[in-house]
From Swiss-Prot:
This is Translocon-associated protein subunit alpha. Residues 39-75 have a biased composition (Acidic residues). Keywords: Calcium, Endoplasmic reticulum, Glycoprotein, Membrane, Phosphoprotein, Signal, Transmembrane, Transmembrane helix. Belongs to the TRAP-alpha family. It is found in: Endoplasmic reticulum membrane. Glycans are attached at residues 136, 191. Residues 19-207 are lumenal. Residues 1-18 form the signal peptide. The modification Phosphoserine is found at residues 247, 268. The keyword Glycoprotein applies. Residues 268-279 have a biased composition (Basic residues).
Amino acid sequence: MRLLPRLLLLLLLVFPATVLFRGGPRGLLAVAQDLTEDEETVEDSIIEDEDDEAEVEEDEPTDLVEDKEEEDVSGEPEASPSADTTILFVKGEDFPANNIVKFLVGFTNKGTEDFIVESLDASFRYPQDYQFYIQNFTALPLNTVVPPQRQATFEYSFIPAEPMGGRPFGLVINLNYKDLNGNVFQDAVFNQTVTVIEREDGLDGETIFMYMFLAGLGLLVIVGLHQLLESRKRKRPIQKVEMGTSSQNDVDMSWIPQETLNQINKASPRRLPRKRAQKRSVGSDE
């Protein structure tokens, strides 16, 4: 009975080994075949991916060419080689916020045909993307004919918004014109990044309001202190002390004539005790 568990353990160990030895090379070949088939499928998929990438790379140049052609067709009009433009800022290239900025644009016709200058416009744009408008100013209609070998000067002014102070923006100034054949041209007279300056001189609305508020607050403090002092004075009434005349020296007798003073002094001597006693005796007799 003790040997049965040992025999069962040996059978469990020996049986799998015999199965493996019997299957031997065939089993190994089957495993190898499966591995090779998997590798072939992986290689095929890699080759297909490379072919797809090559096709995409071949298609990309054609797409870029098409995009460039579309941009050329749908792009904005360019400047004419027969015309020149110049710009001059009246107060220098300083752009104070909430203040007028003036500039002059000169147009020179170097060709043999007339040019019709239609309009002049300006706009602030996002510095990183000039297609994004921040502030678009009103276009100035001109409709001026400039003959060949002649010049013309145009004035334009705009006011940067006050909240734009202290920030950089792209300033674009365009001059739009055409020839007698109807060909439209546009010259970017100015196309640079500028900084709008915060306005420091003068008083703005916020500063005035702050001063008015401080003045009103100071007035209220003064009125409050005055009322407080008045209330304290009312709570402590002044005690009136009656001062009598202790002697004639305290009485001003200068306004009384001297004769009258002499009579008063004679008529009001101090009564003697004898006279008082006589009066008392007379009264008792009665």
